Each structure stands twice: as structure tokens, then as C-alpha cells.
Amino acid sequence: MEKHGDYDIKKICVIGLGYIGLPTASMLANHGYDVVGVDVNEKRVNQIKNGELKIEEPGLLTLVKGAINSKNLNVRTSATEADAFIICVPTPALAKEDGSKKCDLSYVMSAVEAILPFVKDGNLIVIESTIPPETTKKIYETLNKKIYVAHCPERVLPGKILKELVENDRIIGGINKKSAEMAKEIYKSFVEGQIYTTDSNTAEMVKLMENTYRDINIALANEFAKICDEIGVNVWDAIKIANKHPRVNILNPGPGVGGHCISIDPWFIVEKTNNAKFIRAARELNDNMPAYVCNSVLSELKKLGIEKPKISIFGATYKGNVEDTRESPSKNVIKMLLENGATVSTYDPHASYFEYPLSTLDECISGSDCIVVLTDHDVFKTIKKDDIDEICPKLKNKIVFDTKNILEHSLWKKAGFTVKLLGNGAW
């Protein structure tokens, strides 16, 4: 193939074929690069080869098939020689004794070790995985090779990954200027947004700042919800009106924060400094929302004389219209309900995997005392009168607790339901 730009980068090895790695590898292959996609999960590799994706992402299957059919994308379980290596592996958070969390870099370091035998002088390594500040530099210092290393954090939203891979601005931080410029050469082959280059420490911090900002905003909304529950105000109405101010943009409250970014990344700042007390407080507030929801549900049921209830959970994924259950608040809500003697069934038409059993809709609601909505799937938003009429006879008690404010409450009330809304103290 012809080389791209000023640097002789023709072959790229992408390590990790998950939510970020597979779309990135496929995008590069469809833009002319010779790409080897690597994943240690042999089952996943075979599924990709056979066009059987477990990632529910619009347009991804077509993109992957196009890349494989063009012969530009080959997937395998081991690394190989290349001009550039892109690491797209998870960086989960590990719990610490003091109640905080820290970044688990084991997947990143395993990826580095896997490619090390194939890395030659002059090669480029790009780390897309979200990492704490100073990590890129430390990895470079351990390699003892004349290579280039950069950090280009992913910045996409599940459900819109392909669109945002192309349209979003990107930041690339290098351990030196040439590292950043080499990485930029690769990404500008498909990125239509602006690409900003800086040093690796800054790039690492920028990604963490972006998600920390959102986490803190959500924590503020959740604290407002708790206050409004106490003082007799509907927080949703209050936020809507407050946001009419041109310099106010409060996000919505909910049962907690999940996913692989917002619920994790702020901890990577906290672990680096003692000056992140506000960030830690926000993170802890959001982590405690499942307990608040659990206690609110059980308290309301107890007021109605319902002990040891059967509860129907609507939603296992961490956000609407995706199949991703990583760090989902639903897990902790269910865990706490079970610990408090409730029987719990869970319905989610999107989730492909969950720590707790998933039921059909009929199984979930049969004999139930209460429906608790935890995820804002469109299928829940669009429940209409006829659907409610079908649900009613299967329930033991007509109670619904909406933590996302997505149901048409008037329809449920007309059907005889008691409707409870998170953050609505004006019940």
C-alpha cells in the first residue's frame, strides 16, 4: 500500500478488539492501512472472523465486514511486526483499603509486553486506553528502545461510536513532538474533527478532566434530587427551569453513574493527589445513589404495608439503548434489594450479559409488587396505554418507581398505579 503522509506507516497492529479497538481497527483498515487486530479472547476473534459481533453498535458490523473483505483487516490472538501499535484495552478501577479506587494498568502492561518482541527502533506505540497522568512517559522509560510513544484517548459515546470516531475532535499527547505528529498522521486518515497535539501528561489529564466534569455535574444533580425529596420540590421541574439561565447546564439525576468512563476516570485523578477532595466527594455521592434508590423503594413499599416484596427491575445496562452493563448502577441496586429480603427479577431487551439472571417481560412482572425503572431505554419510554393494560393483570400491586423520569406518568396513574419519581418531594 502507499504510505500515508510524511511518515512511512503502512502496517498497524491494534491490541484489544472491544468497544474501542474493533471500531478503530476497522476504520483504519477501511482507510487503506494494513491492520492486524489482536485479542487474547480466541472466541471473540473467531466471532469477528465470522461476522458475529457481540457489540451492539449501529453500523459496526458493516464496517467490520468491509474491512475484512478488503483484506486490509486480519484478526488474530497474537501480535506481529508493524510500523505502529495501538493499545485499546480496559483500564478498570481497583478498590483500595481507604474506600477509594486506583487504575488497574495490568491490561495495558500485558499489551505492552505482548508487542515488545515485535517493536523495532523507529516504531510508534499509541495508547488509547484511559490512564492516569505520567503513565505514557513511565511506559516509554521502561522500554529501552528508540521508539515513539503517544497517548490518544478515546472520546466516543456508546451507540454513536462510528459517528463520533469520525466527527469528534481528538487530542494526541506525545512523549516528544515527533511522537504526537506521527500519531496525528494516522488519525487524520479518518478523523474529520480537529486534532490537537500536546504532551502526553496533558493529554492524559484532559481525558480525565472531561469525564470528571460530567461526574461532578451528575453528582450535583443527584444531591439536588435528595434535597428536593426532603423539602417537597420536583427536582426535574426545578432543573428544567434553572437551565433556562444562559450560563447554567445541570444534568439529570439518576440511580447512579455507570459505564467504563465516567464512573471510573475520576478515581485516576484522586489516586495521584491529595488535592482532589471535591472530585472524590462527587464520586462517592454517585456511588451511593444505588443505596439511596434501594432505601427509597423499600421505604415507600413499607409505608404501603408491603414487606419482603417482589420487585421488577426495568433496565440492566448502564445507559439507554446499549447492551453494555459495565459498572451499571442496576447491579448494586439489585444486590442491596436482595440483601434486604426482596425478590428481584430483571428485564432488559438490550443486555446480552448481566451478573444477575435476565427474565422475559412476563417473567419479570409476574406477581410483582413494584416496577423500578433504572435505565432509559426507548422501549420503556414508549410504553403506551395498551402495554400498561397488558401489564396490570400480571402484577400483585400497582406501584412503579421511575428513577429516570422517562415514563408517561399520567398513563400509569390512569391505570391505577401509584407512581413514584426520584427527586420528586412534591408527591
UniProtKB/Swiss-Prot annotation:
NAD(+) binds at residues 19-20, 39, 44, 91, 130, 326. Keywords: NAD, Oxidoreductase. One of its GO terms (molecular function) is UDP-N-acetyl-D-mannosamine dehydrogenase activity. It catalyses: UDP-N-acetyl-alpha-D-mannosamine + 2 NAD(+) + H2O = UDP-N-acetyl-alpha-D-mannosaminouronate + 2 NADH + 3 H(+). The active site is at 207 (proton donor/acceptor), 261 (nucleophile). It comes from the Archaea. The keyword Methyltransferase does not apply. UDP-N-acetyl-alpha-D-mannosaminouronate binds at residues 155-156, 207, 211, 214, 245, 247, 258, 318-319, 404. InterPro entries: 6-PGluconate_DH-like_C_sf, NAD(P)-bd_dom_sf, UDP-Glc/GDP-Man, UDP-Glc/GDP-Man_DH_C, UDP-Glc/GDP-Man_DH_C_sf, UDP-Glc/GDP-Man_DH_dimer, UDP-Glc/GDP-Man_DH_N, UDP_ManNAc/GlcNAc_DH. GO terms for biological process: polysaccharide biosynthetic process. Its EC number is 1.1.1.336. Gene3D superfamilies: NAD(P)-binding Rossmann-like Domain. Pfam families: UDPG_MGDP_dh (PF00984), UDPG_MGDP_dh_C (PF03720), UDPG_MGDP_dh_N (PF03721). Catalyzes the four-electron oxidation of UDP-N-acetyl-D-mannosamine (UDP-ManNAc), reducing NAD(+) and releasing UDP-N-acetylmannosaminuronic acid (UDP-ManNAcA). Cannot use NADP instead of NAD. Belongs to the UDP-glucose/GDP-mannose dehydrogenase family. Homotetramer; probably dimer of dimers. This is UDP-N-acetyl-D-mannosamine dehydrogenase. The lineage of its organism: Archaea, Methanobacteriati, Methanobacteriota, Methanomada group, Methanococci. The gene is wecC.
